[in-house]
Amino acid sequence: MMTAALTGISPEVIRELKSGKSRTLELQSTHNVVTLARVETGTMVFMTSVDMEDLMAGDPGIIVEVELISISMKRIVEFALGMHFEERERMSARIKVRYVAPSTVRSATKEEITQPTMVDVIKSSCFHAG
């Protein structure tokens, strides 16, 4: 299954999602925001703690369903020595996701930073001997 990939996600967040609860995340990494700009509600997305530069076949992660998505611009205001400096704006994406299944990367497509990160993934199977 070819899908968008969100990389560098905290292992704690992935572990919490695996417990079955929907969770709202705020992502600020440029590559993740660019990827989410092309994702629609209801889409399945791959999430992994592996960094974008290191993503390759065999890397583990999870498939999540995007329930809500919002991309917005925020102003960053910093204070130093009692002076006010408006330094920059920051774009961020807030997404509400729900865990679907464990998954493994079959292949990864890495283009430019301005293009979404795409992966071909397979759902992992788990069998218990009884």
Predicted region positions:
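Contiguous surface segments at macromolecular interaction interfaces
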Residues: G58, I63, I76-G130
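Beta-strand elements of well-folded, non-transmembrane domains
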Residues: H31, S70, A101-S103
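Amphipathic, positively biased hydrophobic alpha-helical segments used for protein targeting
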Residues: H31, E53-D54
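Compositionally biased, charged N-terminal/linker segments
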Residues: M1-T41
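Aromatic-rich, lipid-facing transmembrane alpha helices and their immediate juxtamembrane interface loops
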Residues: R38, D51, D59-I62, K74
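Short coil-to-beta transition motif at edge beta-strands of beta-rich domains
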Residues: L36-E53
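Short, conserved beta-turn/loop elements at beta-strand boundaries and strand-helix junctions
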Residues: L68-V77
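Hydrophobic beta-strand residues in large extracellular and virion-surface proteins
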Residues: G42-M47, V66-L68, I95-Y99
